[in-house]
Amino acid sequence: MAVQMAAELEMAADIVLGPPNLVSAEQRATAESIFINFRKSVCPYTMCKELLETSKNDYVLFEASGLIKDALIREWNELPAQDIHALRTYLLQYVISNPSCSAFVRERIVQVIAIMVKRQSVEDGGKDRSLVIAEVQQLIASGNQQMQMMGCAIITALMQEYATTVKSSDVGLPWELHFKVKKQFESTDLQTIFRFSISALKELSAQIVLPLNSDMEYLLRRLVMISETVLSWTFINVNLPKKLISVFESDQSPSLRPGVAWKEILLEPSLVPFIFDFHWRVRSSSSISHHTLSCLVQLASLNGQTLNAKNLRLEHLTTYIRSLTQLIENISRTASIPGKEALGISTIVRKLILFYPPNILVNIEGELLQKYLEQLVSLTCGFLRASLSPGTDEEEQLLFNEVSNLLQRRKNFRLIFILGI
């Protein structure tokens, strides 16, 4: 039956995807009706698994995995726990065993796994999720680049499912439960993911040889994007009304404001210096450096319960400015700074001034502060000089943003100089 079903669906897929000059409107409508009826199938898990095993048509594989997703959401409460676990295990092993399957098919199956894990975490408190993440960590640590990329895809899908509460509606849960499981995820496995992503980047940074080959560049980019997602996470510590949560989650550049449980992780002394060093190593790769700069911008905005004492704020600021001045010094030796990197650095400065006002800034070591301020003056003058040179509209807009970032808080700098620094 599975062979017959696969043949019928594959024929319909060829018609649906066929060019208009070879497929009549009637043929296309008939083929589309086959998939419409297919999507209505009840308890289709065995049939879909057989299709995944036998069909070589990507469109059929995509539809089969989509049907699993829709059926799971619809029938979750009727399914025995052991059947759910067996299906999740099967899907995970399927994507691991078929690393060469089409990207859009893989992403759909990975999304189904993430939805299952999130839905299960409502009932088991995240136990199954922790098992999945542990298994995925082994993939990333395996040294096999295909398995590492697969592991990154699964982690990314999990994070996407937990990242928002208001917009998450495709797992059959009310938004209040989305909020509950998101908080549960933040306090446990999100920390595990961040620690592991940084650890993997540290290990891989020693293997960086420029120019990067495509596989290494892709893997590094996915790992940095995982770290970036954590550092850009919308941490909401109280159960606010849905409309207010929507406002927070719509913020495109939220500050980094985690709970006190993140103190040990984010204030680890080597974290900030490592990310600055890693950015310096990969700055020639625009596909990665964009994300490393985003990580650094977010760390510049660190505030809240993690820095609940003045000495902690001062220590973090000192560590950050020391690493920043070293980066600027290294860049100055090259006598070249790409526009997007310049914009990133100016955004970092703007965030530092915004979250660490003069009454904090003046307390860092005098020599370091003097060096930092001199570099800011030099950068501002350099950007202004560059703005006088002819360039493209994009370059001119970048320069305008860079100068605006550096001059936006000029009153704060004036106060620092008045205080005698």
Residue ranges and their predicted role:
Residues 1-24, 178-182, 254, 398-402, ...:
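Proline/serine/threonine/glycine-rich intrinsically disordered regulatory regions
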Residues 57-101, 107, 111:
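Eukaryotic helix-linker segments that join adjacent hydrophobic helices
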Residues 16, 35-39, 67-75, 112-120, ...:
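Hydrophobic residues within the alpha-helices of tandem HEAT/HEAT-like
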Residues 27-28, 61, 65, 102, ...:
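Residue-level detector of extended alpha-helical repeat arrays and alpha-solenoid scaffolds
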Residues 20-24, 56-57, 99-102, 143-144, ...:
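Short inter-helical turns and helix N-cap capping residues of alpha-solenoid HEAT/ARM repeat scaffolds
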Residues 1-53:
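N-terminal "cap/leader" segments of large eukaryotic alpha-helical scaffolds
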Residues 2-8, 39-46, 81-100, 125-146, ...:
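Amphipathic alpha-helical segments within extended alpha-helical solenoids and repeat-rich scaffolds
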